[in-house]
Structure formats: structure tokens, C-alpha cells
């Protein structure tokens, strides 16, 4: 059996930067509290916990005011930043620079009187944070079909952003659907490309690899949006696809009769997790 790795996969710049910043802080100043999971990958969260980075799920859990608090790569809204400052906490801001750009565009558009439409999951940490910068003028829309649920009395000036982990073609279809369904109510439309190039590159690489193999294994946390999107991209190519968090989830029957297997990993998936999956596939192929 031939095992092929996607040419672009695993930790993106933003995640790698956030993990390194938290590890460095824990090493230099002692224990650190992360406000929410560092990334949507349980292996990374556990590894950081062992190195002194614990997780508080909300502001209410920040009982110890003596420990530094880390904002995760997903970012937060200005209300959270203000509350951390009010409490006098030392803050380590690991927000991905690409997410910061999205936040600043959300604020700018809202300040200029636009309603801000965000193509993204309203429950995703990044999207919740970006919405916080719109001063109540933002709307998260998870699918193009949900555009019909937008309020009828929206301002005639609309700004459109995307969750950074979405695919470019999906964002393009979303914008097209918005134009088709609301053009008569729009006097001005401003679309800002807030997609992450690293995520897009990984999706392109996954799609290319999916066309060359009989089976795709996508490695990453179940809660990771970009990993789920990778699996969707592979499935769109018609190839048998499985999303696993670890090598322990691999099933021998998946590989029966397969000669070419592809492996990719999401932007929050560490190299060691991908390596373990590849090694386990080799073991299953040899058995």
C-alpha cells in the first residue's frame, strides 16, 4: 500500500504561533490560564496542560487573578478584553493576525454604518469574537440558504466577511446568493476577503490528493472547523473519507483492497498526530 501525504497540512502559522507563545510564557513565568481551548484539538490541549497551560471555559472560571490569562488564536470581542483589563489580569494575546484583520474590518464597517454579514458558524469562537467588534450591527450566517432569515429592515449598506477557515468557492457562492436575493435592497455592498490562505492552501492540497487515491484519512479534532472542511472537500471529490482524531480510531477494514491512501491534517493538528496515523496505517497494511 502506498501512503501519500498532502503537500500542505498540519499546524498553520496562527496555531503554531499561539502554541509557542503559551509554551514560552508557561516556561518563563509559570502556570498560564487559557481562556477557552487553545485550539480545537484535544491532543494539543493535553500536551499544553502538561507544560503548565490550563483551560478556563469562561470568564467566570477565572478565579485566580494572580495567573496570566491567554487569549486563544480564535480571538475575543472587545467586551472580553475590557473585562480582563478591569480585573487587572496579565493578558497574553495569541489571537491569529489574520483573525485580528477580520476583527478590525468588522469594527471599521460597523463604524461606517454598514450591517456586517459574517459567513460563518455563530457558535464558533472566532465568529463570536468578530461579531463582538460590530457593535450589535453584525449577523452570522452559517449557510447561504440561511440568508433568507436575515432581518428585512437591514441597512442598505452591507459589508460581508467570512470565517477565516471557510473555502473560497463556498464564500463566493454565499456572496453570489446574497446579491441574487437582496440586490433590490442594497445600495452599497462591500465584500472583504478575510479567508486564511493557509486554510485555503490546505484545502486545495487535500482536493488534489483526493483525486489520486482510493481513500482519504483526515486527522484533526472533531471540534475543528477547518478539519471538518478538509473532510468535506475530500468527500466532494467522491473519495471514501474518514475523519479521525488519533491513530487509535483507524479501522483495519477501511484499508482492505486499497492500494493508494492519502493523509492530511487540519490547521490545528500537530505533526506528531499525523505521523502516528501514518505509522499505524503502515502497521495495518503489513498485517
Q: What do the predicted segments below correspond to?
A:
Residues 1-287:
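The feature marks the mature, well-folded catalytic cores of soluble enzymes
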